[in-house]
């Protein structure tokens, strides 16, 4: 968790916005995961969200669903995901890594076992898209004791009372979903999202980042104005999806992310 906090402190001191790319572990190939993570850091990533493949990713659109399916067909599970982070940490002890996925794989793996191994691998936070509120406190306590941040989601349909609760318990950063729907959709409402983001930032002690629908430098800049950072997922996953080899995947990661980094650095 400390890596997330330190990263946002540094960015705030520099008046810079966080750039948070999402990739699916094991896609476009098992061999490409760690090299692509390093390529993203070189291109300007501040935090990496690493997707844990799941057979029923209900919050994800077709792009990430298919990416998850491809990874599952390659045999990717939590053990591979944690090993990927462990290998990444051998040459990058600074960049925060947040695992993003669903509760079921963790329950099957065992929450306590997962927590212990995630900490040992160098994971900094976990975002569980479908975590029921009634289970969140117990898992948050387990994660917190190990130094893992439980990243929470808020959306346009989240009630005011629920937002107040989330703002009080958020760790690492709060992830605001820019619209109600699935990942990869293209219907940003910058004004509405901006109003909500300003309100969230005023009532929570952690940074607020925004995702869903961000696909290029222009959309990243529009959404970053009222946020502490932006998450880009489906568009990046698409760019990587058919990379024939590791080198191509790394070049595509750099070519996709570098323009977003340059554009965000102009936003104050």
From Swiss-Prot:
The keyword Amino-acid biosynthesis applies. InterPro entries: Aldolase_TIM (IPR013785), RibuloseP-bd_barrel (IPR011060), Trp_synthase_alpha_AS (IPR018204), Trp_synthase_suA (IPR002028). Pathway: Amino-acid biosynthesis; L-tryptophan biosynthesis; L-tryptophan from chorismate: step 5/5. PROSITE patterns: TRP_SYNTHASE_ALPHA (PS00167). It comes from the Bacteria. The active site is at 49 (proton acceptor), 60 (proton acceptor). GO terms for cellular component: cytosol. It is an enzyme of class 4 (lyase). It catalyses: (1S,2R)-1-C-(indol-3-yl)glycerol 3-phosphate + L-serine = D-glyceraldehyde 3-phosphate + L-tryptophan + H2O. Keywords: Amino-acid biosynthesis, Aromatic amino acid biosynthesis, Lyase, Tryptophan biosynthesis. CDD domains: Tryptophan_synthase_alpha. Transmembrane segments: none annotated. Its EC number is 4.2.1.20. GO terms for molecular function: tryptophan synthase activity. Tetramer of two alpha and two beta chains. HAMAP family: Trp_synth_alpha. Belongs to the TrpA family. The alpha subunit is responsible for the aldol cleavage of indoleglycerol phosphate to indole and glyceraldehyde 3-phosphate. This is Tryptophan synthase alpha chain. The gene is trpA.
